[in-house]
């Protein structure tokens, strides 16, 4: 008869509570680090540790996150900036590493060039949510490989010769685009987990609604309420804490140009929601439904909506109150009353603001924010820099950096935003999108373009990035080379590619060596005792022509 198979438990029951208490103490010690001095966590160390498994895993993302924090902390304190751009593929990441200290992975670029479904499209975040983490992995694995390759080359040379060899830090921290999180809070947590597993040092997440997400420079953006986006930021931090990683969370707000919001549930959003001030109009949705049922379509429906909107006289509630104050014959000193109202109503809910107006003797105000709601049920909102500042202040305790998406590279607006945030949180790091969607030639003269990053850095924008520079530079050289190649054949390759590579010392000119052929030969020789008749870089390799 076979003996009973004894299987060990996952953890010794007599030690379980002691191990838990020890790990909780370690987490509390971790959270006491100055790194977290501005971070608010609405959960406990006990809750975090209880969500971990018994096997402790050390993620490379943690080392990269610490490195990124050190970079941004140093830049912010010196009112300097780390600036980078969206990287497309491994060739690009190795060239960026020579000159830039961070790497960006764009959702827009991934959507158009690297969807995990292989179906390209615009930046609507409708690609599988593994897409951007997979691109992070693609680049991070390349970073690790080229770091190994370079280290081997240096250690294979005498110390006296190493000054002639490259000593590039290929392990530049990667910051990636998490869009809106691709779903609810558990989706945000799973996405965060993927980014950490793939090697990201930081991620940014925006306050748009997931089903209607748009590129920051498209129309039709729909915001979620402030509390919903805070929950996303908390979800990111909680997941990173469970995994023991210092991942940076960057909060992006699209409030500057947004026109819609999903709900009026958060009082912090109330001051920016638009209401109809014309009591003679029926609700827009009712009007549109009636028109549809009568057979109207397309342009006819649009004309009906446009006419309704023109008559509705949509306003923020505060603006409606001030207009009533200024037009009321019963109010003496309307300027003083308006100032008192605006000061008292700041940050208040609509119900509270109505009560304040009434207490100051303001006549009853007709203001209906349900009447203009869209067919999808969204409320209309008047965005702007003030709306973005309001949201940034709410996000600050939960975010390592904050980014306001903007329509133009407007220094004065960037200054207004920075000063608004820093009036409440002076140590808040800021990020800025140096977008290729802007027409830089018409936006500012060349000398101002050259100083723009530096001027923004002085305001606290310590991380700046061109989202799609990888895409545009690839398109530019591809168009230029393809055109010339079609006209002059191999002369185009020599003049436009190979000769400039050699003159500028671009290492990819020796593409076999760049790809790691020498390194892999040495791996093979190590295994076979030092000799390999099939070495890739042996006698006859054509790269000898470039010595």
Swiss-Prot record:
Pfam families: ICL. It is an enzyme of class 4 (lyase). Pathway: Carbohydrate metabolism; glyoxylate cycle; (S)-malate from isocitrate: step 1/2. It is found in: Glyoxysome. GO terms for molecular function: isocitrate lyase activity; metal ion binding; methylisocitrate lyase activity. Substrate binds at residues 106-108, 216-217, 252, 433-437, 467. It comes from the Eukaryota. It catalyses: D-threo-isocitrate = glyoxylate + succinate; (2S,3R)-3-hydroxybutane-1,2,3-tricarboxylate = pyruvate + succinate. GO terms for biological process: glyoxylate cycle; tricarboxylic acid cycle. Its main location: other. Catalyzes the formation of succinate and glyoxylate from isocitrate, a key step of the glyoxylate cycle, which operates as an anaplerotic route for replenishing the tricarboxylic acid cycle. Required for growth on ethanol or acetate, but dispensable when fermentable carbon sources are available. Also acts on 2-methylisocitrate. This is Isocitrate lyase. It comes from Pyricularia oryzae (strain Y34).
């Amino acid at each position: 008869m076979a003996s009973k198979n004894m299987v060990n438990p996952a953890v010794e029951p007599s030690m379980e509570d002691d191990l838990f208490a020890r790990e909780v103490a370690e987490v509390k010690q971790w959270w006491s680090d100055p790194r977290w001095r501005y971070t608010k966590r609405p959960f406990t160390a006990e809750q975090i540790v209880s969500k971990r498994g018994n096997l402790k895993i050390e993620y490379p993302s943690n080392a990269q996150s610490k490195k990124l924090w050190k970079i941004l902390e140093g830049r912010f304190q010196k009112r300097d900036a780390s600036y980078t751009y969206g990287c497309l593929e491994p060739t690009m990441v190795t060239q960026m590493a020579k000159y830039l200290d961070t790497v960006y992975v764009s959702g827009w670029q991934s959507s158009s060039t690297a969807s995990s479904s292989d179906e390209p499209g615009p930046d609507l975040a409708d690609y599988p949510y593994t897409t951007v983490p997979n691109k992070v992995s693609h680049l991070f694995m390349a970073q690790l490989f080229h770091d190994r390759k370079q280290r081997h080359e240096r250690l294979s040379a005498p110390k006296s010769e190493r000054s002639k060899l490259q000593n590039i830090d290929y392990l530049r921290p990667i910051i990636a685009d998490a869009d809106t999180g691709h779903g609810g809070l558990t989706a945000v947590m799973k996405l965060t987990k993927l980014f950490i597993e793939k090697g990201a040092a930081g991620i940014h997440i925006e306050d748009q609604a997931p089903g209607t997400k748009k590129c920051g420079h498209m129309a039709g953006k729909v915001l979620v309420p402030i509390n919903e986006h805070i929950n996303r930021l908390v979800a990111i931090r909680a997941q990173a804490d469970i995994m023991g990683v210092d991942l940076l969370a960057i909060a992006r707000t699209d409030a500057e140009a947004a026109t819609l919001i999903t709900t009026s549930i958060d009082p912090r959003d109330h001051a920016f929601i638009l209401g109809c001030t014309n009591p003679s109009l029926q609700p827009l949705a009712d009007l549109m439904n009636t028109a549809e049922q009568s057979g109207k379509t397309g342009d006819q429906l649009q004309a009906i909506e446009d006419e309704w909107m023109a008559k509705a006289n949509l306003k923020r509630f505060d603006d409606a109150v001030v207009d009533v104050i200024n037009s009321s014959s019963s109010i003496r000193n309307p300027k003083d009353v308006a100032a008192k109202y605006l000061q008292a109503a700041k940050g208040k809910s609509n119900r509270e603001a109505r009560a304040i107006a009434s207490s100051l003797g303001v006549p009853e105000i007709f203001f209906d924010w349900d009447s203009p709601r869209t067919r999808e049920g969204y409320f209309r909102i008047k965005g702007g820099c003030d709306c973005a500042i309001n949201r940034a202040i709410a996000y600050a305790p939960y975010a390592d950096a904050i980014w306001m998406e903007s329509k133009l590279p407007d220094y004065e607006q960037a200054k207004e935003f920075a000063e608004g945030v820093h009036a409440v949180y002076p140590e808040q790091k800021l990020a800025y999108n140096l977008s290729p969607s802007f027409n830089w030639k018409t936006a500012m003269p060349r000398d101002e373009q050259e100083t723009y990053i530096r001027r923004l850095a002085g305001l606290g924008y310590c991380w700046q990035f061109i989202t799609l520079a990888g895409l545009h530079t690839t398109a530019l050289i591809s168009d230029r080379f393809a055109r010339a190649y079609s006209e002059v054949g191999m002369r185009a390759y020599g003049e436009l590619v190979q000769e400039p590579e050699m003159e500028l010392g671009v290492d990819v000119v020796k593409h076999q060596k760049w790809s790691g052929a020498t390194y892999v030969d040495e791996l093979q020789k190590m295994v076979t005792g030092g000799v390999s008749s099939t070495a890739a870089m042996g006698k006859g390799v054509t790269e000898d022509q470039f010595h």
